[in-house]
């Protein structure tokens, strides 16, 4: 399973996401299926554009997201948005996968 390093971000303004992209980052959102709030993170385009990682984004596989080197979230890739004429990723949507045991 692919492990992606991420940095938690608190501001979600359009100007902030533009700065993230300008500095070589990629904004992303981890959506929760339950009513808990969504998690906004920043990924590195350098990690995302690695040849071994590109095929994961095309297949909608499960990934592990390591946030601030503190905790890991398992998620499924929901949507990947690419720049219109460049080859870089500009936004990713993830869906948080929870493991619930049935009794």
UniProtKB/Swiss-Prot annotation:
Domain of life, per lineage: Bacteria
Classification of source organism: Bacteria, Pseudomonadati, Pseudomonadota, Gammaproteobacteria, Enterobacterales
GO cellular component, one term: cytosolic large ribosomal subunit
InterPro entries referenced in this protein's UniProt entry, alphabetically: Rbsml_bL25/Gln-tRNA_synth_N, Ribosomal_bL25/Gln-tRNA_synth, Ribosomal_bL25_short, Ribosomal_L25_dom, Ribosomal_uL5_bac-type
Family statement: Belongs to the bacterial ribosomal protein bL25 family.
Protein name per its UniProtKB record: Large ribosomal subunit protein bL25
Entry keyword annotation includes Ribosomal protein: yes
Gene symbol of the encoding locus: rplY
Subunit structure, interactors included: Part of the 50S ribosomal subunit; part of the 5S rRNA/L5/L18/L25 subcomplex. Contacts the 5S rRNA. Binds to the 5S rRNA independently of L5 and L18.
Organism of provenance: Blochmanniella floridana
